[in-house]
A protein has these predicted regions:
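Acidic/His- and Gly-rich active-site-bordering loop/insert found
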Residues: 21-128, 137-159, 168
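Short loop/turn motifs enriched for small/polar and acidic residues
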Residues: 164-166
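Surface-exposed loop and adjacent secondary-structure segments within mature catalytic domains
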Residues: 169-175
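Bacterial Sec-dependent N-terminal signal peptides
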Residues: 1-23
Length: 175
């Protein structure tokens, strides 16, 4: 009986160690994926910053994210819920389903140059005071990293990036 108990504890410990190693490896690979896409993600964020489109008018911004998702192998559905700038980008199949929101709308009247002092890029124009250029881009970057892990067979399931317009003023998170 003691041998069986000792063997069971040893096996459980080995499985736990293998699982912990697997999780560490996946975390490392996720980070490497983000680093691999860093230049592309920075360009995306910068382009959305420059577009600075307000609620339901984020046509350039949504296209930038849609194009990047397609280049990275996602299936994209545009015009979700009848909202022209809403979209989903999905990869994989089955469960779990990992959903990631990505906002990209700007605020009216807060245009800003990339400077630490107040200086409008376009006087009276829209700007990204809440950092949605970063949020939308970073969220898509996370979805890409997860997609690559699904593709490698390291994790199972589906990842869905929800391109979320009009977060600042209307209702986009409810669709």
């Amino acid at each position: 009986m003691k041998r069986i108990l000792l063997l069971s504890i040893t096996l459980i410990s080995a499985v736990y160690y293998i699982e912990a190693q697997s999780i560490r490896t996946i975390k490392k690979e996720l980070q490497q994926s983000i680093e691999k896409h860093e230049t592309e993600l920075i360009k995306t964020s910068d382009a959305i910053w420059e577009a600075a489109e307000t609620a339901l008018l984020e046509f350039k911004s949504s296209k930038i994210l849609i194009d990047q998702a397609k280049r990275n192998g996602f299936d994209v559905e545009e015009g979700v819920a009848g909202i022209k700038t809403a979209f989903t980008a999905s990869y994989g199949s089955g469960r779990p389903i990992i959903g990631i929101l990505g906002e990209f709308d700007a605020n009216a009247g807060i245009s800003q140059k990339r400077k630490p002092v107040k200086e409008a890029r376009i006087p009276g124009g829209a700007g990204h005071g809440c950092g949605h250029n970063l949020f939308g881009t970073a969220s898509l970057g996370a979805a890409i990293a997860i997609k690559e892990q699904i593709e490698k067979g390291n994790i199972k399931g589906t990842v869905i990036f929800y391109g979320t317009p009009a977060e600042e003023t209307i209702f986009a998170k409810v669709w």
